[in-house]
Structures are given as C-alpha cells and as structure tokens.
C-alpha cells in the first residue's frame, strides 16, 4: 500500500511539475511578446537612410522629370571632400548637388529610384539677364545619405538665378541588347537639361 501511495504521490508530483513548467513557459512567452512588439515599433520609428545625416538640404526647386531620369537639385553648407576638388569649403558659398535617379519607366534596366552612375553633369547659374555667373562640372561622390553629383560653389552674390544641369549619358557603360537579357531603351544622344528657374539665394539667410 505504501508503495502504491508512493507511486501515486510521485505521479501527482510529476503532473504538478509539468503543469508548473507549462505555466512558466506560457508566462515567459507572454512576457516576451511586448519585447517583440517593442522591437517592431523601434524598427518602424527608425529614421530612413539620410534622415539623420546631420544636415538640412535646401531645394533649388521641384524635382524635374527629364528623359529616363528624375533630377533633384539641392544645396547646403560647404563640405570637406577627399580628395579635395574645386573650391575649398572655407572659400565656398555652398555645396550644390544633383540627385539623379532612374524614373519608373526608364527601360534601361535601372530600378525605379536607383542612382544613375557614370553620367557627366555640367551646371550653369545665370542671373535674370541671362548672363552666366558660374558654370562647371559636378563630380560624382558619396555622402552619408548616399551617392550624388556635387561640388562646392565659389562665393555667390545674393540674387535670383536660373540653375541648369546638363546631363550627358555614360561614355563607357554598355547595355544588353539581345532578346533574352536585353533592355528596351537606349541612352540619349544629346544632353538632357534639368532647369530650376527663379532660385533665390541670400547668403545672410543661411546658418553657415
């Protein structure tokens, strides 16, 4: 009888232990759920690339759709670059950028919004009389918010200007043309021009 009671008691103890472990496991799963939700929330609230870059871009105007490209023009404080090209930051009025991405219907094999490399991007800044006050070629470069074409500009007087980017196609960039792997589009043969008219520049209104 004692042996039977012992066996019964052992069985009950085993069942109780199993129940306790199951309850602990369920509680642990419940306790860990907020952590997963918290992680999801943190990911959702994380800044997108470039949002926390530490500088504020000012637009030259609205984005311009030209050919297979979407072109944005921005400017902000002069920057140091490696290697140093053009005007040093200390002698510059601003850093200007052409953000050039592929349009959704580009037919050149780029994904919509992809940076388009290998371009030659010339710029011209004209006063309202049509006189060119600055011109040159933007350089391909990377910043903390990604690749672009840019340059530090020499000192520029306050005024209202028309800014143009003249975009030439890649000179040594091949396209597949066969039926199996080829793309439908072809690179443009004449420079594409993205224009930003009536840009107002006031060096006393910026923080740098």
Regions found by a protein language model. Give the residues of each.
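Bacterial N-terminal signal peptides that target proteins for export
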Residues: 1-12
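Short coil-to-beta strand junction motifs in C2/discoidin
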Residues: 90-94, 110-121
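Short amphipathic, basic-aromatic surface patches that mediate peripheral association
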Residues: 81-82, 95-113
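Solvent-exposed serine/threonine-rich low-complexity stretches and specific carbohydrate-binding patches
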Residues: 134-143
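C-terminal motif of bacterial Sec signal peptides marking the signal peptidase cleavage site
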Residues: 19-23
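Short acidic/polar inter-strand loop motif in beta-rich domains
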Residues: 168-181
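Short, low-complexity, disordered segments immediately C-terminal to signal peptides
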Residues: 24-46
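Aromatic sugar-binding surface patches on proteins
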Residues: 143-150
């Amino acid at each position: 009888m004692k042996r039977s009671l012992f066996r019964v008691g052992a069985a009950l103890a085993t069942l109780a232990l199993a129940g306790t472990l199951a309850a602990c496991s369920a509680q642990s799963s419940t306790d860990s759920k907020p952590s997963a939700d918290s992680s999801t929330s943190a990911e959702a609230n994380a800044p997108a690339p470039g949002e926390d870059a530490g500088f504020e871009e000012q637009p030259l105007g609205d984005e311009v759709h030209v050919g297979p490209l979407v072109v944005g023009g921005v400017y902000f404080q002069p920057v140091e670059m490696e290697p140093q090209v053009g005007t040093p930051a200390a002698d510059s009025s601003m850093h200007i950028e052409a953000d050039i991405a592929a349009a959704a219907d580009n037919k050149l094999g780029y994904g919509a919004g992809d940076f388009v490399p290998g371009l030659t991007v010339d710029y011209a800044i004209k006063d309202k009389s049509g006189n060119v006050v600055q011109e040159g070629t933007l350089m391909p470069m990377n910043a903390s918010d990604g690749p672009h074409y840019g340059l530090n500009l020499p000192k520029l007087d306050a005024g209202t200007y028309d800014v143009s980017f003249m975009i030439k196609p890649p000179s040594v960039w091949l396209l597949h043309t066969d039926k199996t792997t080829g793309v439908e589009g072809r690179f443009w043969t004449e420079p594409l021009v993205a224009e930003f008219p009536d840009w107002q520049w006031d060096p006393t209104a910026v923080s740098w």
